[in-house]
């Protein structure tokens, strides 16, 4: 073993872990220190699918088992790509990797030992290249989600928007610089690098830390670091492959029926003019089509199930609302001493939310929010002061507290299910048909949606242009225009308008609204590609599936609207109740400032 470990201190023996998806996952001995670290063990308590168990009770998996599965598939994918390429390609790739690592300004002792030598061929890494890269790729697969906050993607926006209050101005500046330089805006990727850099050296006693860091962090294009990173996060990646199979098994659906062996064993390493790529060979087209279809169906029926969407939305609003109320000025018009005492109580239970700097410690201590359980404990501890504020003499405090208590009922314990204006494509069209004048006015005011820029081929763009003239697509375009950009700012503004102007729905009484866009899950031509020899082609050039899936995405509802009653709603929402909510939504939104262009 090359590195800092002594010859009489070899790495631990490999360990085999039982897994419901892959049967057995092999953990290389060199990764045992990393697996046992506090940062990776924290993932045992970070849910994979947030509150999707609202509708799928057994969908209770955590990021830890997904990290092990991704590690397992990453090694298999790398080994396949290395095995299937020609000797001269292997030689050029290994030479470039070792040369670049040797030229790095700083290297940890283990990496430095691997690349030491007068010439590239003299380095200990040269004959062990495939194994060393396999270990590095395995480590990246294991660590790829280590930066997720409690409840994963659902609370990423909360942490990013309040990073100064939660982590300080320096962290905010560093995160902004990372996003600008890398082109990656995902908060958890920045957080993962922060956690990686604070992991103790003991975790990397038998691993080339600097090499792992290069692969984990680089998103620069087609060089070898991005090429290796793409095994975990790329056009076809083992991250997506593992979570589709794992989530499907837990949810009890058939949507994980994917020939993963065919896919992984079809990975190929190619040299391109600007660098290197790892992608799927054409022999995997049928398996790739199945993967894309199952992915689209998984999002449609599981991730974007209206009950799961509203539970996640309620968790986000509840967390944001409690934190913002606790941080608000102590004096509010109409408040009294009891209100100030309740606000003080609310502030006193807010934990240290900086999970990034506590992730590497097992002994983070009381009052630190590192995972899902900590966050739920905080929300539950907030109920007592919120209940006191719900009787406040201040209309503002009383209204905010009442909404937060109802949101907590939705997202924790599932004591309340808001009423959706529509639950599926059929009901979406029904609501449009029931409100033809309003829908026609909304569509008329909105520009015709543009053909998605990610469709490269002329056939795809022409077909998409025809789809965009259909009613569901036109209505989606109108609502997309009203609800604004990817930050969901427009959705929040419309939500506030609806709650202020339409606080009552027949049959449900008084309440408030939640509006939640659901992302456009496209099959992008530049990412869905296959290799035929040395030629890379868009999948849409050899398969009709990308266009068919784009059609589904263009036509399906792009948002959900919910009414949250303050009273007790019917146990089961019938069609008439949902119709009443849908009618109220369309009539109110037609008069909103976003629709009319008038100032609020």
Predicted regions and their residues:
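Histidine-centered, transition-metal-coordinating active-site segments
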Residues: 1-139, 148-600
């Amino acid at each position: 073993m090359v590195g800092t470990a002594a010859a009489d201190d070899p790495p631990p023996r490999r360990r085999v872990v039982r897994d419901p998806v892959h049967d057995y996952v092999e953990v290389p001995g060199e990764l045992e220190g990393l697996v046992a670290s506090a940062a990776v063990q924290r993932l045992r308590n970070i849910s994979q699918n947030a509150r999707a168990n609202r509708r799928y009770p057994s969908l209770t998996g955590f990021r830890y088992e997904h990290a092990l599965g991704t590690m397992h598939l990453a090694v298999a994918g790398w080994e396949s790509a290395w095995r299937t390429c020609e000797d001269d390609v292997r030689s050029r790739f290994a030479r470039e990797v070792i040369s670049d690592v040797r030229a790095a300004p700083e290297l940890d002792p283990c990496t430095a030992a691997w690349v030491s030598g007068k010439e590239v061929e003299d380095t200990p890494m040269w004959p062990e290249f495939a194994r060393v890269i396999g270990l590095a790729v395995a480590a990246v697969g294991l660590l790829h989600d280590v930066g997720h906050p409690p409840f994963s993607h659902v609370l990423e926006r909360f942490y990013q928007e309040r990073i100064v209050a939660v982590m300080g101005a320096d962290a905010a500046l560093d995160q902004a610089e990372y996003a600008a330089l890398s082109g990656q805006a995902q908060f958890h990727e920045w957080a993962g690098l922060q956690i990686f850099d604070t992991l103790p050296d003991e975790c990397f006693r038998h691993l080339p830390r600097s090499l792992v860091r290069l692969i984990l962090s680089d998103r620069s294009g087609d060089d070898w670091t991005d090429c290796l990173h793409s095994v975990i996060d790329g056009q076809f990646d083992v991250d997506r492959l593992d979570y589709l199979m794992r989530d499907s098994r837990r949810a009890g659906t058939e949507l994980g029926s994917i020939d993963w062996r065919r896919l992984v064993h079809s990975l190929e390493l190619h040299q391109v003019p600007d660098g290197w790529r790892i992608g799927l060979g054409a022999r995997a087209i049928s398996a790739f089509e199945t993967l894309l279809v199952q992915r689209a169906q998984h999002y449609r029926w599981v991730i974007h199930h209206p009950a799961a969407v509203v539970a996640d939305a309620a968790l986000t609003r509840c967390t944001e609302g409690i934190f913002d109320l606790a941080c608000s000025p102590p004096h509010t018009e109409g408040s009294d001493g009891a209100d100030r005492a309740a606000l003080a109580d609310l502030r006193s239970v807010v934990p240290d939310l900086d999970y990034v700097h506590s992730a590497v410690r097992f002994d983070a201590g009381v009052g630190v929010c590192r995972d899902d359980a900590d966050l739920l404990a905080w929300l539950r501890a907030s109920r007592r002061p919120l209940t006191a504020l719900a009787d406040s003499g201040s209309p503002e405090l009383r209204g905010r507290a009442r909404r937060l208590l109802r949101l907590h009922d939705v997202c924790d314990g599932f004591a309340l299910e808001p009423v959706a204006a529509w639950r599926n494509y059929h009901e979406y069209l029904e609501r449009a048909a029931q409100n033809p004048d309003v829908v026609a006015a909304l569509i008329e005011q909105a520009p015709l949606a543009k053909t998605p820029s990610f469709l490269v081929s002329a056939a795809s763009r022409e077909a998409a242009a025809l789809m965009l003239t259909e009613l569901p697509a036109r209505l989606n375009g109108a609502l997309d225009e009203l609800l604004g950009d990817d930050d969901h700012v427009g959705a929040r503004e419309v939500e506030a308008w609806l709650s202020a102007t339409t606080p009552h729905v027949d049959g449900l009484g008084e309440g408030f609204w939640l509006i939640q866009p659901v992302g456009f899950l496209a099959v992008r031509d530049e990412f869905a590609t296959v290799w035929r020899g040395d030629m890379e082609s868009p999948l849409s050039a050899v398969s009709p599936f990308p266009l068919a899936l784009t059609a589904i995405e263009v036509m399906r509802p792009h948002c959900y609207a919910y009414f949250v009653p303050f009273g007790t709603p019917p146990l089961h929402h019938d069609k008439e109740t949902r119709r009443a909510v849908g009618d109220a939504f369309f009539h109110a939104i037609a008069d909103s400032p976003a629709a009319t262009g008038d100032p609020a």
